[in-house]
Amino acid sequence: MKTLVILSSILGDRSHSKQLADHLIQRLRQHEPDGSIRVRDLAADPVPYFDGATAGALFTPADQRTAEQAAIVARSDALVAELFDADRIVFAVPVYNFGLPAQLKSYIDQIARAGVTFRYTAQGVPEGLLKNKQVVVLSARGGKAEGTPADTLTPYLAQVLGFVGLVDPVFISAEGMAMGELAAQDGLALARQRIDALVAGAPQQVAA
């Protein structure tokens, strides 16, 4: 399988979400020696914010774009092409102030494109076009919020990923990262166990 791993933490190797991603990558290489893994680090190589210039470029007909607009669209096209090419897409996401990092939001704004990754049917029903992908979200947070109203990350990502066709994401979270060393170790250990089970093929609960 072709796996695309998208990192979004600003902390580099100190990031707990990256540590989970590294663990998953290690397990995948063991279980799928013939597979390929591509990593995109949104902090090391940021995606530009979706601004007026970007919107203008995307909504200008291809034969009328300036050279600058063509470059903007080409950058977005490259991000989208990675998604279509992958069989499995992994998002490593830290929770910042109850939400996702700005880097990941910028990425989502660049790849959620009408007529490209989603469309509306004649009946006005949205249809995601990134189909038949395995989707995994590895998150880490300082406190504990899974299954409570304070967890705003899970419903948002389930909604926006599903909108572009990335349905039934498996969420694996390491919680309690800022609640002391023992709590952090326990949270990471539990998340790694779930990653091991996922790679081994054990059934996983997906977001509702």
Swiss-Prot record:
Keyword NAD: yes
GO molecular function term, any single one: oxidoreductase activity, acting on NAD(P)H, quinone or similar compound as acceptor
Alphabetical keyword list: Flavoprotein, FMN, NAD, Oxidoreductase
Reactions accelerated catalytically: 2 a quinone + NADH + H(+) = 2 a 1,4-benzosemiquinone + NAD(+); N,N-dimethyl-1,4-phenylenediamine + anthranilate + 2 NAD(+) = 2-(4-dimethylaminophenyl)diazenylbenzoate + 2 NADH + 2 H(+)
Family designation: Belongs to the azoreductase type 1 family.
Subunit structure: Homodimer.
Descriptive protein name: FMN-dependent NADH:quinone oxidoreductase
Source organism (scientific name): Bordetella petrii (strain ATCC BAA-461 / DSM 12804 / CCUG 43448)
Lineage, broadest ranks: Bacteria, Pseudomonadati, Pseudomonadota, Betaproteobacteria, Burkholderiales
Encoding gene (name): azoR
